[in-house]
Amino acid sequence: MPKWSLRRRPGRTLGLLLLLVLSFLVLRRLNWSTLVPLWLQHQRLGLRTKGPDFILEDSIFQILGGSIHYFRVPREYWRDRLLKLKACGLNTLTTYVPWNLHEPERGKFDFSGNLDLEAFIQLAAKIGLWVILRPGPYICSEIDLGGLPSWLLQDPDMKLRTTYHGFTKAVELYFDHLMSRVVPLQYKHGGPIIAVQVENEYGSYNKDRAYMPYIKKALEDRGIIEMLLTSDNKDGLEKGVVDGVLATINLQSQQELMALNTVLLSIQGIQPKMVMEYWTGWFDSWGGSHNILDSSEVLQTVSAIIKDGSSINLYMFHGGTNFGFINGAMHFNDYKADVTSYDYDAILTEAGDYTAKYTKLRELFGTVSGIPPPPPPELTAKMVYEPMSPALYLSLWDAIQYMDKPVTSETPINMENLPVNNGNGQAFGYVLYETTIFSSGVLSGLVRDRGQVFLNRVSIGFLDYKTTKITIPLTQGYTILRILVENRGRVNYGNNIDSQRKGLIGNLYLNNKALKNFKIYSLDMTKQFLQRFDMDNWSVIPKELTFPAFFLGALSVGIYPSDTFLKLEGWVKGVVFVNGHNLGRYWNVGPQETLYLPGVWLDKGINKVIIFEETMSGSMVQSTDIPHLGRNQYIN
């Protein structure tokens, strides 16, 4: 057989090389062949508009979308949730991108594990879903500071969501990194991304007319070539419009549907209509009720939107969980922090189970497309485990010695400006302030969000938004004054996001005299924080407990680890960690009564459970296979 070489067979070799290149390009495109008919695969026109219709290549395309946030769902369950979205008859996935989680410190990016955005998008494509990406930089999404990193607030003059130089400089560096990851996943490059949203609901903020054109240009300059969209509620719709960007609307009630045909038509003429967020339920706040939206009402409204010829995205299709401390808050008349569960009364439950909404909408979407949707995946197994009684204990005051050395400062320093985490401040968790006092009197100060006040180791009350003063009783000699301040969640929506600094804000006063000389401990409750506690540091639970305190126990799991929900009857307020995973906050004010524990985070055999309790502990932690999210309240 002859020995082939470039020298001896240049024509043949060149032909083979061209064939290989062509094969690579075809195979690259065929990775997405489940998304559209094969005869469209050679096209590169992408999503565009033609009169009242979306056109994908040469075909009219109605977007039937659903929102799932990869950062609120364990990675091991991404496939299950996306298959359920596809099986509901939907053709498009939408997701936000949280800047604060992807860049926890300036220039330090994290797209690994549960934050692997590229893997999530590629998985959606393999399952047969288009993707609409919503990269912000602000995303709202009931997440801390609307997804903006807290280190931005180190600048005392910071003006978020404007063309203020300190903000735009940070946005550009973040977009440089983010867009390098997502640009290759656009449709015209062979990927599933058919559209990208410019910021989020800016019409309701509208502090800088140059800002939205700036964000549009920032996206385009970094290679975004697919259709651009804006997203606003009906009140902010007109103010959120950007030249060359398709406006879409967010709504819930059938009474708001008129805006589809009136406001949208008036601001952009005959263009495709899309409800970018049809709110399938609502989020919950601590101290409130569990909000629900009747499935029949959901079906009626979605049917009306479809009948109108509009495209739609279900927000949320699957809400998931605010694991850790990522929940946001609202602050209009009162400050209200969001609960750990982001169940949202969505189409799938927090744990990914089917609902009446799913059954009804699957039938509707199957009728719309004329093609029976694929069969739904089986339910994820649930399990009730034996109750767990903590065996070991470590009071916060004894734990301090194992923490990093405190910051010393003449005056209090807010959380974001603490010289920790390589100069990026502290984003989440608690801060402990400590100073010495020599007299009694009235203690006052600005505490954000909730501060438990101690004399030595004895709790004497709380300071928060409503309680700004507390009486210090008469003491002999000097006393150590301690305030444990919790960041309960930065506001994610509204005009006051610039003022979301946490901890002690400004001076702390005793009898109107500023206190000095503080020790400040950062209690961010990360995995690294908890790893400081060796087994030798723990002790058997004593008869007389001192709070706050950490409790250590073991959850025994059989051969097949499965999802469960932890119920903390008798416990008051704190955080639960299982095998290093922060499940989130619990609080007996409700409405949420159980914490979701994914089975994929459990090991066969013994599982390590740590509870940080602020006030009073129960005797055990129970497991149940049914979530308890509180008393239902129908959304008006």
UniProtKB/Swiss-Prot annotation:
Main subcellular localisation: secreted
Domain of life: Eukaryota
Localization in the cell: Secreted
Enzyme class: hydrolase
Annotated catalytic residues: E201, E277
Signal peptide location: 1-32
InterPro entries: B-gal_1-like (IPR026283), BetaGal1-like_ABD1 (IPR048912), BetaGal_gal-bd (IPR048913), Galactose-bd-like_sf (IPR008979), Gly_Hdrlase_35_cat (IPR031330), Glyco_hydro_35_CS (IPR019801), Glycoside_Hdrlase_35 (IPR001944), Glycoside_hydrolase_SF (IPR017853)
Molecular function GO labels: beta-galactosidase activity
E.C. numbers: 3.2.1.-
Pfam hit, one: BetaGal_ABD_1
Cellular compartments per GO CC: extracellular region
Family: Belongs to the glycosyl hydrolase 35 family.
Protein name according to UniProt: Beta-galactosidase-1-like protein 2
Source organism (scientific name): Mus musculus (Mouse)
